Design a protein with these regions (language model features):
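Class I S-adenosyl-L-methionine
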Residues: 1-168
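C-terminal target-recognition/interaction regions appended to catalytic cores
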Residues: 128-262
């Protein structure tokens, strides 16, 4: 569900295409992930209609807001996970239990070497390369300490839109650095850009690399992505973190076993 733009944005109707597929395929279980905004003011009507459709098809529907940092992912990432359980399977589903241990940015990418200055991959680590920052963005990132965002920038380094009223316009976490001993912010489809979030490296004067973003999403260090840089960033940022997906999948398998169905 889009937070901005017209209410009739066609992307807001994609959830109903998903419900149509569920109706046609009629699986024992289904999983659906969506942004937290689906339960907000703009998305609430869409969510209620979606849940009604799924229930009418013949499913018991479970919905819960999960934060990936509670499931072994070093990232603050809140998403609604909707689980559908076909009515003949019984009501057995239980969401994965939260983990006691939390991981940090340092745990995940702290051991990676600094990528070359020339923009090439670090030898043996694909996609671990740096983007060249503009002169103004180099000044901005050099001003910031780990964990700080644009609210710590002096006025002369603020973007023009933030100079108007820095308290209400935009996100305070843009033009920021990650903190070593905290989880990362949500890895989005534009995490490769220093201007799009708190995606600066904690110490080095650069945005995080595609490989670092992928690792914060819990992709294996050698996982391959295809397409342009923009395509790969989108593949990484739009994904459900594999480690979280695995736990959800395991919980469904456990549910199926408890059902006694074959």
């Amino acid at each position: 569900v889009q937070r901005r733009g017209a209410d009739e944005d066609p992307r807001n109707q994609l959830v109903f295409k998903y419900a149509q597929l569920v109706d046609e395929l009629y699986p024992r279980y289904f999983v659906m992930e969506n942004v937290s905004g689906i339960a907000g003011k703009r998305g609430k009507t869409i969510l209620e209609e979606l849940l009604d459709k799924l229930k009418n098809i013949g499913y018991t529907v479970h919905i819960k807001l999960l934060d990936a940092q509670n499931y072994g992912v070093a990232q603050r990432r809140k998403r609604y996970i909707i689980i559908g359980e076909r009515s003949d399977m019984g009501v057995n589903y239980e969401y994965p239990k939260e983990m006691e241990k939390h991981y940090t940015v340092r745990d995940v990418i702290g051991s990676l070497p600094e990528p070359p200055e020339d923009g090439s991959d670090y030898p043996g680590i694909s996609l671990h390369r740096r983007d060249r920052l503009s002169e103004i963005n180099l000044k901005r990132i050099r001003t910031l300490k780990p964990g700080q965002g644009r609210e710590y920038l002096p006025k002369e380094l603020l973007a023009d839109c933030h100079k108007i009223d820095s308290s209400v316009i935009g996100y305070r976490n843009v033009y920021g650095r990650m903190a070593w001993d905290e989880v990362s912010p949500t890895i989005t489809a534009r995490f490769d850009s220093f201007t799009r979030g708190k995606f600066g490296h904690p110490e080095q004067d650069r945005s995080i690399s595609l490989r670092e973003g992928a690792m914060l999403q819990t992709f294996p260090k050698d996982f391959l992505f295809t397409g342009s840089k923009v395509d790969m960033a989108r593949q990484i940022g739009n994904a459900v973190p594999p480690l979280l997906a695995k736990q959800i999948g395991t919980s469904i398998i456990d549910c199926y076993k408890r059902s006694g169905k074959s």
